[in-house]
Amino acid sequence: MTREYILPENETVYKANLHCHSTCSDGAMSTEELKALYKSKGYNVLAYTDHHTYRYHKDLADETFLPLAGYELNFDKFDSKRRLNKTCHINAIAIDPDKAIPIEGKGIYKVDVINDAVKRLRENGFVVNLNHPSWSNQGPEEVLQFDGFTAIELYNSCCTRTYNSGENQSHYDAWLKAGKKGFAIAADDNHASCNELPVLCRRLFS
């Protein structure tokens, strides 16, 4: 029988979550509590991506835990009665937190506005990921209008638990079939407690 390795045989692999929220925005746990919780579950890397709040929690870093600095931005579309009927959420994660420059966090749902924000964020030192398009009421063909995303959330466990809308395989398939490049990631989008869903990273950024 031939042994097949799902993970790289001779490389270091880190367990990471690239999307979570603390009491700095609408999360239920402090940044310190999140660190303790994720470390207890075997995580090495945690991206703090609070809504419209960019902070680098450098003091939380230690030999076995790396906090990533980031934030989540949203772009909203409302109907005539001011009800939200479509949104686009993106995560910006700093490559070098000491050099990255955040931009304004809120915007309207227009393709050119979103693409411009992604472009500026990349120029300012961030990788930019598209969050939970199914939950955001974005169809697979709609995401093809966007450019510059480093990755798409293939799965978001918070959206699955709350609205059964966390799976985004069709969006990623459409993305690849259109010739666009991007990684697939899974995240728990934690607002309260950790779901044991590892994201295994060979390298954080390319």
Task: Describe each PLM feature range.
Residues 183, 191-206:
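Catalytic cores of secreted or luminal carbohydrate-active enzymes
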Residues 2-127, 131, 138-140, 145-147, ...:
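A metal-dependent hydrolase metal-coordination microenvironment
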